[in-house]
Amino acid sequence: MTPSFLMLVLAFEWNSKVAYAAQLREAMKWLGEQEGTVFLGQAVAVPGTAMFNTLTDVPLEKVFELPVAEEMQMGMVNGLALEGFVPVSIFPRWNFLLLAMNQLINHLDKISIMSNNGFKTKVIIRTGVGSQRPL
């Protein structure tokens, strides 16, 4: 069974005594154990970055570093989702995600409609929010 947002929420009960980053790392580890899940984005394979630090328990063969090309990244996510993968698309900052809105709104959102429900894509989009140090 492939993971979905609901399954992710149900799998992890919030523990206020554990740091947010530790719980995020645990959630990414769980996703990394699921068949078909891949992680791609910017700064995901660069040690010392906030995004990398939450992926330390994810198998390296599931993590793909991409250049700064947000629309291309979301296009890859669309293709992977159409092939049955569950891509976790990681953007280091939310304002980088804005550059991928064409692929997100005009393509990913409409795949099910355009294929007459032939494709039901599953995608997880993750981004950091904060003024200096989001995590």
Residue ranges and their predicted role:
Residues 5-135:
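Thiamine diphosphate
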